[in-house]
Amino acid sequence: MAEWEFAESKPSDELAQLYYFSMKMPQPGGVVEFVITVKEFANPRDHSLKFFASADKQTNQKTVPFTPCGWGESLLKALAECIVAIHKFPYEGN
């Protein structure tokens, strides 16, 4: 357990450490940059959900908007799931 995790006084606080990543996805109109935030929860409700990754932009905006995300027991798993989710649909923003 990392030292910062002991700072959480109540599990309902859902204390999390944040990690930031960026990736670029080529699109017909140019390159779109996504910023992915990964949260590492101090005391997750389920150990397999310790890490949650979420993109800063939605994809598939003109049909059914979708926010790419991923869960996992490791930072790598959550980040990789989010990247796969980004590639599932086209970016249809401005």
Briefly describe each language-model feature range:
Residues 74-86:
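Stable alpha-helical structural segments in soluble proteins, enriched in small hydrophobic residues
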Residues 1-3, 87-94:
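Short intrinsically disordered terminal tails
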Residues 32-63:
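A short, structured beta-strand/loop element
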Residues 58-77:
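A short, exposed loop/beta-hairpin motif centered on an aromatic-Gly-Thr core
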Residues 13, 28-30, 46, 67-70, ...:
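Intrinsically disordered, low-complexity segments enriched in proline/serine/threonine
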Residues 1-35:
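Negatively charged, low-complexity tracts enriched in Asp/Glu with abundant Ser/Thr
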Residues 7, 26, 37-41, 54, ...:
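A structural detector for beta-sheet-dominated domains
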Residues 4, 13, 50-52, 75-77:
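Short, intrinsically disordered, low-complexity terminal segments
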